Each structure stands twice: as structure tokens, then as C-alpha cells.
From Swiss-Prot:
Transmembrane segments: none
Top-level class of the enzyme under EC nomenclature: transferase
Involved pathway(s): Glycolipid biosynthesis; lipid IV(A) biosynthesis; lipid IV(A) from (3R)-3-hydroxytetradecanoyl-[acyl-carrier-protein] and UDP-N-acetyl-alpha-D-glucosamine: step 6/6
Catalyzed chemical reaction(s): a lipid A disaccharide + ATP = a lipid IVA + ADP + H(+)
GO BP annotations, alphabetical order: lipid A biosynthetic process
Source organism (scientific name): Flavobacterium psychrophilum (strain ATCC 49511 / DSM 21280 / CIP 103535 / JIP02/86)
Its job: Transfers the gamma-phosphate of ATP to the 4'-position of a tetraacyldisaccharide 1-phosphate intermediate (termed DS-1-P) to form tetraacyldisaccharide 1,4'-bis-phosphate (lipid IVA).
Record GO cellular component, one term: plasma membrane
UniProt name for this protein: Tetraacyldisaccharide 4'-kinase
Keyword vocabulary terms for this entry: ATP-binding, Kinase, Lipid A biosynthesis, Lipid biosynthesis, Lipid metabolism, Nucleotide-binding, Transferase
Similarity field: Belongs to the LpxK family.
EC number: 2.7.1.130
Length: 343
């Protein structure tokens, strides 16, 4: 934590007080939460950015979409549109936001929608002729006007919420006690070989903020063994020693760079959800002469429309469980099968 953020601690106390009052009003029913008559699963975190929500949503889509009609509902952060939008063939990353557009491109058999007002978004989805059977709420842990039936709280292994502080001193959107709303906690971005002892130590620390009711799971990021352009694929091992331009506009891109980087590579870092401007594209083209460009899947959906290059590739990732994958799947499926209302 840098010195400037430490000096902002009084504002963190004030912000924590305001969010605690808001949560208290929802908990007491003074502020209303709206439930819906289908399974609604909310995936989110207590902190800002970098916990791996997108691969976790994609895991749930793969788990459930073979049997159920799925819809994802996101805010569509930094999109250049307003209101409720249901993804369609004319949609792009600027209209939907990068993550929803990635869902739409990757999973053509599901419905993808964006709405800042999640209550209105769900109502619009349920008014469709082919309305969804399950709704996955992306980054909605703090969106308390909707009462989801199942809450999955994510926290990154190297940045556990129990060690964090309220904004602006730290990165917490609400106090650690907000974890009590979680039905399940997933520690993301773990070492693949994390020991059982380390897992148990983290579990004991986390459930103290959850009234000991949530089960804790551990996942790691699994990188694909290939990179993909619009029309071809290359093995990662083939390009690892080649001279490359690595580019990321995501929160906490260090592991992405570490996985691909060799001695002669150049890395470009942009803010999370960055809108690539013409000057950015010019700079990328200049630096990428005689090199392949590798970026994240989320950045690829934004860049590919502006950087028409056969040398632009992305590296897909998945969220996989260190252990207890079947146990996780069963809990989700049991909730869906037993849920007729979220009330």
C-alpha cells in the first residue's frame, strides 16, 4: 500500500460506514431486494477487479448450458451504450462491453444481455418469448436491489479480501463482513499445486467472515496450449522463444505476461477495459513490426475490430478446480434443480 493511499484512510472509514448503512437497510428490509421465480446465480467479489469473474462465469455456462437455457446479465462496464441491450449479430464490444461480447462470441446458444439496472434487465429477459431458465449475474455481489438465489464470492489467492481495506485506501467495495451473504467462496488464481494444509489455513480465515456457512473452493488459471487469431492457431511452445509483442488491458496482467514472456519480448500494459484509441493502434502497429501480437481474449474482442492483422492472437484461459470439482458442480446443480423461486 503506497503512502498516498494510507493518507486517504479517513475517507475509507467514511466509505465503509456508508456502505455498511446501505447493507443494513437492505438486510432489515427497509430497502427492497427483488426476487425472481427462476434460479439466479450471482458471481462477484468484494474488491475491484482482477479476481477472475469472466472464466468463472464461463465455467458455469459450460456446466449448465447443455441442459438449460442460460442468460448472462452484465452491467457492460465502459460500453458506449445505455439501457438494456440483448446481444445480436450487430453487437460489438463497444455496444456490449468486452466481457459480455466475449460471452456472446464464445457461446452462441445462450442469451447475453447488459443492463446497469439488473432488476430491469432480469424483467426484460423474462419477458422474452424464449425466456431463460437460469440467469447468471456477472459482477453483481453489491447489486442488492436483486436478491439472487445463490451467491458465489471470488477472492484472489494473492489478494484475499481478509487482507484488504476499504477504498480508497485499499480495494474493497464494501467491508469484509459482506462475505456473510455468500453461499460459496472460491479462492481464484491459486498455484496449481497448493497444498491441503495451505487450503485449510485459508478456509479457516475466510469462513470467520461468513458465519461459517459457505463452502470454500480453490481454482487455478489453466492456459490453453495454443494461441488463436481470427483464422489460425499456433502452439504456444512454437512461439514462446520468438520475438513477440505482448499486450494486456486487464486488471493484474502479470501472470499473463509471465506465462508467455521471453527475453526479447516487449510488453504493453493498458488500463482494465481500455478503449483502444487511434494513437494506441498506431503505437501497437509500430512496435509490432515483424512480430506477432499476443493479447488476452478479452482484449482481442476489442482490438480485432480496430487492428486488422493476421498477426494478432489471443491466449484463452479457463478456471479449473484444484480439487473438489464434482462437489462444486453438484452444489450448483442441486441449487438449480431445487430452486423454483429465489425468495
Amino acid at each position: 500500500m503506497n503512502f498516498l493511499r494510507k493518507t486517504l484512510f479517513p475517507f475509507a472509514i467514511l466509505y465503509g460506514f456508508i456502505t455498511s448503512i446501505r447493507n443494513f437497510l437492505f438486510d432489515c428490509g427497509i430497502l427492497k431486494s427483488h426476487a425472481f421465480p427462476i434460479p439466479v446465480i450471482a458471481v462477484g467479489n468484494l474488491s475491484v477487479g482482477g479476481t477472475g469473474k469472466t472464466p468463472q462465469i464461463e465455467y458455469l455456462i459450460r456446466l449448465l448450458s447443455n441442459k438449460y437455457q442460460i442468460a448472462t446479465l452484465s452491467r457492460g462496464y465502459k460500453r458506449k451504450s445505455e439501457g438494456f441491450i440483448l446481444a445480436n449479430p450487430t453487437s460489438n464490444a463497444e455496444i456490449l462491453g468486452d466481457e459480455p461480447f466475449q460471452f456472446y462470441k464464445k457461446f452462441p446458444n445462450i442469451q447475453v444481455a447488459v443492463a446497469a439496472n439488473r432488476k430491469n434487465g432480469i424483467e426484460r429477459l423474462l419477458s422474452l418469448p424464449n425466456k431463460p431458465e437460469i440467469i447468471l449475474l456477472d459482477d453483481a455481489f453489491q447489486h442488492r436491489k436483486v436478491k439472487a438465489g445463490f451467491y458465489i464470492l471470488l477472492t484472489a489467492y494473492n489478494d484475499l479480501f481478509i487482507n484488504d481495506f476499504m477504498l480508497p485506501t485499499g480495494n474493497l467495495r464494501e467491508s469484509r463482513s459482506g462475505a456473510k451473504r455468500a453461499n460459496m467462496i472460491i479462492v481464484t488464481k491459486c498455484p496449481k499445486d497448493i497444498s491441503e494444509l495451505a487450503q485449510n489455513k485459508i478456509k479457516e480465515a475466510l469462513i470467520n467472515y461468513n458465519n461459517k456457512k459457505a463452502e470454500v473452493f480453490f481454482t487455478f488459471i489453466d492456459y490453453d496450449d495454443k494461441i488463436y487469431s481470427a483464422n489460425k492457431a499456433l502452439n504456444v511452445n512454437e512461439v514462446k522463444t520468438a520475438s513477440k509483442l505482448l499486450l494486456a488491458g486487464i486488471a493484474k496482467p502479470e501472470s499473463f505476461f509471465a506465462h508467455l514472456q521471453s527475453q526479447n519480448d516487449e510488453c504493453l500494459v493498458y488500463p482494465d477495459h481500455h478503449h483502444f484509441l487511434e494513437k494506441n493502434i498506431t503505437d501497437i502497429k509500430e512496435k509490432a513490426k515483424n512480430k506477432i501480437i499476443i493479447t488476452t481474449e478479452k482484449d482481442f474482442v476489442r482490438l480485432s475490430e480496430k487492428l486488422n492483422s493476421d498477426n494478432l492472437f489471443y491466449l484463452p484461459i479457463k478456471s479449473l478446480f484444484v480439487n473438489n470439482e464434482k462437489k462444486f458442480d453438484k452444489k450448483i446443480i442441486n441449487y438449480v434443480e431445487s430452486s423454483t423461486t429465489n425468495g
